């Protein structure tokens, strides 16, 4: 399938997919290979939440939250999320931060500010954007849209391995149940349900290594006439 989208001077590749589909790792390696900027949209919400706690801004103070989001100094580099130049990748995974992210994201102006920040990551020479609605909502004109899939069993096994490597105990059956429940919620929600864009390339990573998945995306990108 050849893209009919016009060439954009600052190309974007979107990598969407469900939890533990490998999109974060694939996006980071792809960005490093191409020398592109990287956006981890899920981490962006958590970074805003963490900053709001650190600066003492209440979850109900919409005006202060919007200003905070506009002023945040955020970078994603080599798989790390940085706030004000400090790696906070572990801090943003805390349950309390996740709860705060959910609490602030219910406000329309806050969501709009976060969408604007995501789009501001589009800078030369290009961007790889990882998330759930990158190709459908945030960057509908992306030169290449990829939707990663994998069986729930494969994703649960990956998440279990990740947690064990980080020193956390985890039950794979519980992880599998949680993933299936989250998939159902994400696919059926009214606002920006998790689904591939109509013109997205589907890539099942169940039996693929990370390198194989990255190579496939690079092949698609080259086929569009883009240097890779």
UniProtKB/Swiss-Prot annotation:
It comes from the Bacteria. GO terms for biological process: nucleobase-containing small molecule interconversion; pyrimidine nucleotide metabolic process. ATP binds at residues 17-25. Coiled coil: none annotated. Its EC number is 2.7.4.25. It is found in: Cytoplasm. Its main location: cytoplasm. It holds the Pfam family Cytidylate_kin. One of its GO terms (molecular function) is dCMP kinase activity. GO terms for cellular component: cytosol. Keywords: ATP-binding, Cytoplasm, Kinase, Nucleotide-binding, Transferase. InterPro entries: Cytidylate_kin, Cytidylate_kinase_dom, P-loop_NTPase. It catalyses: CMP + ATP = CDP + ADP; dCMP + ATP = dCDP + ADP. The keyword Endoplasmic reticulum does not apply. The keyword Cytoplasm applies. HAMAP family: Cytidyl_kinase_type1. Belongs to the cytidylate kinase family. Type 1 subfamily. This is Cytidylate kinase. It comes from Burkholderia ambifaria (strain MC40-6). The gene is cmk.
